[in-house]
Structures are given as C-alpha cells and as structure tokens.
C-alpha cells in the first residue's frame, strides 16, 4: 500500500520509506473509553459500569443486631442542566445527577437469641447521591467554570514482586525480599535478615518471624515443615541409621562416604555419583544406605516422637537432634523417625531459623497471656505488632488476622493483582478471588527462598509489566468507593446507637451523601491529578490529556523518587515517549504515551508489532504488553526493506529483552510497526529528530506546547506528517460527520448536505469565535471550505487556532541566516527583520477576563452604576448608563471598566436628612468608589461583556439589551436551520417522486403529465406544501406511505428543533445562580494584540531557543543576490556545542521547498496556453523524488480546478513530510537541490545590508519553522514608582501581581559597598525601602522640585527591637545621649 499525497486538506510530499499499515489510534481514546466504562451513559444495560461495581462492593449494609439491612438496587444518571459554554460563563460545574435506588428491609427477630425470623417490612426509595462531573466532548471537565483535565496515573501494579537489595548493616551482603502489594489493604513483606532468618512484616511495622504468620493461620509445626522441606524417613536397625537410596539426592559431589547397610563403602566422599553407577547399584538390589551420624546431628524432627507404651509425646516436631536424644530413642525402642531435610537442593535453613527465632517471644507471651495454644499466641503476637498497647483476646486476634488479608471489604488485589500473582507463582486461582489465599502466602514464601538460592527470577519494579495506568474512570471509582466507605461507617455508627422502634425509618434517614460529595469535589478541585488544562494550543491540550504521572495519591513523592524510577527503561519502547518529559524536579516522573500505544483492559500499556513467520513479515498486527514481549525477538524498523516490505538482509538488528543484537531474520517473531512508534506526539512533530541530541529534542518537544496561536500562522514547509493527526484528534477544528456537498458557509455556521444510506441529510455545524482559553489565548474557528465543495466524512471543514488547512500550524516559515549580526545575536539572542513585524507574522491576540461583584453588605447593598463620586465626566464617557464599559472601547491602564459604589458604614441618618436625600438624590458623601479599573500594563479592545443578576433584583438596561441581542441571534439561527430542514425535506420528496411513474394524469405548473410518466424534478421546485398533498395522490400507495413517513419524520425533527430553541431561550431568561451575598456579577473581556517585541522568547523545533534582541529595518538586514532580504539572523555558535543538527537539515529542505515554490509561481505568471499541463508535470516531477507515493496517478487524475488550488498552496513553498528516523536522505537531498537549482552545500552569497558589501564567506541560508512562545515580555516587564507596602516591615511588596518593587538583596548591597557608593546605598536602604517618614518627605520634595532631605531611621530597626522584646530582652531606643549616661 502506497502512502497518500494528502495531508489534511493539502498536498505534502511524504518521504516515508515504509508504507503506513494502520491509522494512528485516536489520541484521546484512553480517557474517553475509561470514563465511558465508568458511567456508561449511552448503554441500555449499565450493570457492568464502574459506578454499579462500586455500589455493589459496599452494599448491602447489615445491622449487627439483625434489626435491618440496607440494600442497593440500581443507579440512575440524569441529564446535564446547562451546556458546557454556560457552565464556563456562569462558574458552574458541568455535571449529571447520580441517584441510587435503595431498599430498607426490616427483620422480625427473636428477642432472646437476636436471630432473624423473617421479613417484617420492605421500603424502597430513590436517593440523590450527588452531581458527578461529566466529561465534555473534548475529554476535559468543567469544575466551577474552569476547564480541567484529570491526568492518567502510572502506579505500581498490585501483585507480588521479588527484589534483592544491598544490606545497610552488614557489608555487601544481599538481602532478599518479597512483597505482596494489594490495590487496597495491608502490604505484606517477606525479608531475610543478615543471619538468614526469614521474617514477615505488615505495612512496614515491626518484623516477626515468618512462621508466626503461618501459625496464626492455623498451621501446626509439622504442617509448616512438610510445606517447605522434603521429609527424610530414618529407620533404626542395629544402632545404624538407614534411609532409602534415592539417586536424585546426590546430584553434586558427595560430602560423605556412601555406605550400604552392611557397612561397605560404595563411593568415597568428594566423588560424583553418575547415573550409570546409580543404575548399577539399583540393579544390584541396593535399597537402603546409611545416614551418617555427623550429618544427622543438628537436624530437626519433622514429626513428633511418641512413647510406644505410654502414648506420651517425647519429642515434638522441630526438636533438634543430638546424641542424648538418639540414645533415648534406641533405649525405648523407637524403630523409625522423620527429619526435615534442610540440606536438600533448593531449600535452606531459613524456616527452621524462623522457628528458633519465634520460640522465645512465644514463651514470653505464654506466661503473660496464660494461653497454651501456640497458634492463638501467634495471632495475638501479630495483633500486638499492628496495634501496640491495646488489650486483646484470642478470638479478637484470630478475627483481626483474618480481616487483614481475607476480608473482601478490607483487602482487594483486583483482577489485575490476581492475574499477576497467578502468572508469577504459577497458581490457578480463579480471577474473581481478589483476596489472598493461604496458597498465595505459602507460594510467595517458597519463591523468596528460591530467589535466595539463585533459582527464582528477581523482578524489576520499573518494568512496564509491573506498572499500570489508572485512568479517569478508575480514579473516580476509587474516590466514590472511599466516600461510600465513609458513608457505610456512618450508617453502622448510627445503627449501633439507635434504639426503640424502627418502623418509621426510611432509607434517607440512614444515608447521608455528604461524605461522597466532599471526597469527589476534593478530587476534582484539589487533587494532584486534576490539573488546570493547558490550552495554549491544540498540541499542548492533546499532550496534557495523554500525560502519565507517577505522582498523586498512591503514587510516588517527587522529593523521594530515585534515579531508577525516572530513567528510560527498555520496556518503554513503543509505549512511553523517551523524550517528552519536563525539565526540573519532575523529570522522568511525568511522561507521555507513545504515538501508537494503547492501554488494555487491565491498565497495561501495549505496543503494536507486525507478526513475522519464517522470516517473512505478514500483514497481521498485534498489540503486546511488556510482559508478553519478554523473550521475543523483534526486528527493528531501521533494517532495510524491499518493495514488498520484506527484509533485504539475512542478519537483522533485533531487540531481545532490551538488548540489541544481530540475529538471523528467520529467528524473529515480530517486526516494529513503524519507525516513529518509539516517541510521543510532540517529539514526532520534530523533523530530522534523529540528528538532534536527546536533551535538545526534549526542549523542542516541550517548547512546541508553549507556542502561542498567531493571527497569520502557516503550516510548516518541512513537516513530519504527524501534523494532520493532532488536528484530526483535537476538538478545536470542526470535522464533517457525513460526506456531502457544502450548502452554506459563513463566519458562524456551515451547512453540509450529505447522504447516508441513500437518504439526504443537511448537517449543521456552528462555529465559535473570540473565546478565551485557560491561558488567555484567543480561540476562534474559521471555515476552510466553499459553497458547492465536496467534503468527505471526517474531513476538517473549519480550522481552529494554530491550524492551517486541517494541519497543525504552530509558527511561521522564516528565512534564516546563520551568521553574527553586529554582536546582537550573542548568547542565543535573535535578530529579526522589521518586515516580519509589518506583515503581522508573529502577532497574537490574547483575551483577558476582568470581573467585579456587587455584594450585599451589613450596611447596605453595593451598586453597579455610572454615578460615581469624585470622578470627572470625561473619565466616565466610555461607560453606558448602567456604568458598564461599551463593547468596542479601546482601553488603557487606569480606565474605569465597571463603575461600582459601596455604602460607607455610617451613622443612621435623621429623618430630615433622609427626606433631603430622597428629594435631591444626595448620595455622594455616603458611598465610596469601588470601581473596577483596567490594570496599568493592559491595553486592548473590549470584545464582550457578561452580566449576571441575582433572582429578585431588577435587571439593568444593559442586561436587557444584551439579552435582546442574544435572543435575536438565536431566532436568526433557528430560522436558518428551519429553512435548511425545509430544503432537506423538499430534496427528499423530489427524489422520492422522480423515481416512480404516475398512476393518474396530472398537471404541474404549465407541464402536463400522463399516467406512466416520470416527473421532472425541476417542475417540483416551485410547488408549495398544499399543492404537493394533491400531487401525491397521483402516485401508488407505496409512494404515498413513503411520503407520509418522510413528512412525519420532518415534523418530528422540526418539533425537536423548536424544543431545543425554546430550551435555549428559557436558559437565557432563567435567573442566574450566584454565590451567597452576591447581587450582580459582571465579566469584561478585553482582547489585546501583541506584536513581536524585543524581549519576547522564540524557538525552533529543535530546542534552539532565544530572546529577540533587536528588530532591524528591512533595508539593513543582509540580502541575497536577487535582492531578497533575510528575516532572521541566528548565531552559528548555537549549533555545534548543542548538537542539534536537525535544524540545519530543516533549513536546507525548507530552502528547496521555497525555491521550488518560486518555480511554480513562474509557471503561473507565464500564463501560456497549456500552463496547467506544465504545472501538473512540474508538480509530478517534484513529488516523484519521494519513492513511496503514487504521485503521478493522484495528480494526473486531479481536476484542473483542484490542481490550481493546490498549486497556489505550493507556490508559497512546496510542503514536505520528513518522518522521524526515515526522513530525507542524502540522495534525495541531491535530487531536490538539482530540481531547485541550488548549490549542493546549501550556502548562499550574502551582501551586508548596511554597506552593500559582499560578505566574505558564503552563508548558510534557508527556511526554518519558528515559533513565538508564551513567555511574552509584555506580561513580564513591570515598573513602579510608589505603591503598596508590606504591613510589618514597611518595605515595598514584591512581584508584578501585587504591583511590587524591585528587590535589592544582600548581594546587591555588597556590590554597592564594593564600589564605595555610600550615598546611593543609604538611599536604597532608607527612603527607597522602609524609612516611612523619609519617603513621604522625599515624595513631597520631588513634586515641589526641591532637594531631597536627609533620610531617617528605617522601620527595620523598630521591627528588630520588637522582635528582641518578644524574646524578653528589654531594648529601648533613645533619640539622643543624655549627659549623665
């Protein structure tokens, strides 16, 4: 399959070396599918939804005294009350109401035994739980009017994990540990200590020997030994100790002589027993051999030894054998006994050591608790470790141990945890058992012993098989569960304190949903994973929603996270982007999903691969998790391929478990899907990424997310082909829901007439304009289709911000020269031509929101008015009669935006005063000016005003005017839509009536038709509805019924439209919801145009960033031989040390694109007879440089009109896609340079713009894509003369937000001291800082034009004395020295 020439709505020459086999999955599907699983709003059967699962895990709730039970039946989710836009304007949460249906069962019970006898009464009730925030179509949430994103969390998967760590106490000895990690509940650790005793600890509490755990679970000593050791049976014959001969016991060299029962030495110590020899011995009838006495001593009994006569236990299991005990055995005539064989292969003495370690503590407990049974004592021991200092009974301890790991309410491994446990330990426990079993604990301990003996596999906690993703659905489910658990506890507490009859009880008396409300709101408004959405541009928004954070509840803490967690792991390949992560303390903790990766139902990330069979690549594509990939050989995408997509070489570069090796192609199981599956979306937008150093690529990926939307952005000449994907999956653009023809387009709507299953539909697409984003950038959509144009399903029909013809467009293509310019580009500074500023190339629009509230106060109500005391009329000229600024006003710092007066706290006026006031409206003296002023650094145009008024207060004239405008707009929109639906109806009817013959004669207009004729559609155009009803009777019944169906369908549609329209009008007239005490709320939106200025930060896509140092007149910039001036001068020294060579290649390719564009322009200008034919040939010649595209067919079949449209686009520069790791190579560069008639080194002769002299060296000139970042100098620079002061120190406050001063710190003081500038220093530390009287005197002197007087005492001195006095030191300050002191 060849790659397409289309990218978005334009043509782009794609240099991919491999065909694209599958579409990149929707970039936001993880969040969408996760939330859909949680609520399942669209599904009829919601029994499998996350909400249902959570409710069912908490209910039913039983009363301990068997009086009643609260059961859960089902839940119901409502509809949102407001639209997304209204929630954002009114500061509300976009949410749906969640109700649960509950059943309260009252039981009849036996008053003596308290046992249930039967059901007394059943009551059902639907209870409102709370509003659950609803995910918008753009996968964000609106919380209190602010758009937020819930980031996916990457946390440790539940399950079991085994590690080795260096001991902190005893030298370089390794300590082995195993951990059972649940999703909810207590963690269980098993660990060796330096003395080889195996311990267990719960939740990092004090450790206890592991045998205590088993005994608390009810295992006897004998059971435990049997579980962990092979049992050796010893027979006593003639004072000799014999055991059966088993060749498997002698796999290594013998440590003692092998002696048969007659005392004959069969094999000397130190020799090996071969299989052949062993077989000979068996053939000779050897069945028993002697167990050496020296080995038997220090072994332990596996079963108790009972006196044959009395039946009393002489020696219990775990008794250590010594000579006296052996003597005693032979004396009483014991014939055989069993020992635990701790010398066998694969076991060690750790369990025996643990028994020995626990004996002393149990002995002590026995005395204090007065209990004989050691199993009960073990349970008490665990209880005392977990809850030190609390009194305990043996029954309570037993229940406590059981609840720790075996109670579903307190312990949950989840299906994932159970799957991981089964996989690691080789168990077959069903998936639905999500608590621990005894088998889990036993097998885990066995595995720790195996690991210690070098047989088990040590886990890597950073392996992506041990880390999983919790997306929004699961995180929200956990929060809901936490809230329900609190509620459950509250219900149980309520029931335990209730007494008396319960017949009148209803479910709502017990259920208090406050607990749930608080946990969910806390999660959305204050949780670490719920973040303010980054809306700077479409890319930043998409990447924010694809982010994976290791922080948050249940995750890591960034201060304590080590280097390993942050590092790139081999399993990240194709799953997590190795490049895109923040710089600074979060590096490596916050990651992004790779482009093609998906997350499976268990939360593990999967990467796609092509299946290989017998060295051939097949078309089958599979998604594998990191665990499934283990041990598989995967051929890399960088290997050479032939035309059919098969590997050319017999030996290929292969990945096996993170190692990179050369392997025969026949051994490979899979092949990489594509070369850019390794990185994330932002990194795959960097062309020639393979030529950049990783650190710079990281900066490049991060800085693209900071690019501000420009007025005149353009798609890059040199792209990577990923631009269209970001545009496709971000909500900013408008995509066609069906294929069809564009019927009507204007700045606010698009109507597309499409057909679906043979039926005609007219789809309506509203466009949004001048909205403010979270980062104060302007959001607007503009149509990119024309009336009559054919659009396909999913095609972009309107661009959003930072989009150009359905592609992401973050910046501008500028002509760049790498050369110094009078020292102005020292240290990465950037020199820019004035031409770009004149062209508005880097101009952006920012919208700021200013708001003011009028409140109800104790002594009256604040008022929004034009009548403001002590303000001149000319300062109010731009306000309307309601005191609110008019839309379209140019504002600058210090102008009043909204006039507001607040009543003074005053003495009650006398009746006379009240009368005078009523007559003359004398108000000024009793109110103070609290108006909203424009901040000093802001200037712009008022683009919108929103006014909200509380119920019960009159709406002012301005509010009514705004409402009328909005109503008129809605009416117009409704009318337009009705016209369109009428047209749609007529088209369908016409189509229906022109396909079947008439059954009667009929006259339509001036045309007569006979029975059997087919009507001409044009005759029906002028027919009205009533006439149509008459015409239809001349058709068959089948057509008539079809016509009636169509008519009814459209009547229903119109009714729906009308209801929708009325709903909008109702919302418009609805009273506004305002916080308590607020009477009126006004929001003013100011749009500011920001041109590029000196001090703005700019960057390329390769991490090459800098600050604009000077803007040079166009005539002074260096120019080429044909007179074209350079736009930007960059410092050549910024390239070699940073090793981002990608920018040089991008420049060369960009220059080739622009030169070829000039050639296309010349073809246009030549206007010869067959210039279209020449254009087509030229475009085919250019596109044929890339091999993987059938350009001749695409361009050859294209209509002349469309070809001219694309040629005009290419005349501004031919657009290339150079995908990462398979971009333009040297051969292709040569071809392009030859076509573009450029020198092969890409350098150009330049002339000095100031002198006109030729510059001595030829210079590297080309087109580079340059972005303007949102660190704008206008938002940072700030100046103050006087302003607010800090209350205690009386020094000026700091920061632009508080209108603060410049900090003159300790080091700056040293600098002035070093210069000996004593007068300046004194001024800095007194009148410019905190000498209160001095600064007032200085201000007066400056305003009167006098000399500045001497400074006084700084406030700091008084603060110091007060501080010393607070430490009980009596410090006084005397103005002058008295004579007698």
UniProtKB/Swiss-Prot annotation:
InterPro entries linked: DNA-dir_RNA_pol_bsu_ext_1_sf, DNA-dir_RNA_pol_bsu_external_1, DNA-dir_RNA_pol_su2, DNA-dir_RNAP_su2_dom, DNA-dir_RNAP_su2_hyb_sf, RNA_pol_bsu_bac, RNA_pol_bsu_CS, RNA_pol_bsu_protrusion
Domain of life: Bacteria
Subunit architecture: The RNAP catalytic core consists of 2 alpha, 1 beta, 1 beta' and 1 omega subunit. When a sigma factor is associated with the core the holoenzyme is formed, which can initiate transcription.
Function description: DNA-dependent RNA polymerase catalyzes the transcription of DNA into RNA using the four ribonucleoside triphosphates as substrates.
Organism from which the protein derives: Sulfurimonas denitrificans (strain ATCC 33889 / DSM 1251)
GO molecular function: DNA binding; DNA-directed RNA polymerase activity; ribonucleoside binding
Keyword Iron-sulfur: no
Catalytic activity: RNA(n) + a ribonucleoside 5'-triphosphate = RNA(n+1) + diphosphate
PANTHER family, alphabetized: DNA-DIRECTED RNA POLYMERASE I SUBUNIT 2
A Pfam family this chain is assigned to: RNA_pol_Rpb2_6
Residues forming coiled coils: none
Matches recorded under Gene3D superfamilies: 2.40.50.100, 2.40.50.150, 3.90.1100.10, DNA-directed RNA polymerase, beta subunit, external 1 domain, DNA-directed RNA polymerase, subunit 2, domain 6, RNA polymerase alpha subunit dimerisation domain
Top-tier EC class: transferase
Protein name, entry field: DNA-directed RNA polymerase subunit beta
GO BP terms, alphabetized: DNA-templated transcription
The entry's keywords: DNA-directed RNA polymerase, Nucleotidyltransferase, Transcription, Transferase
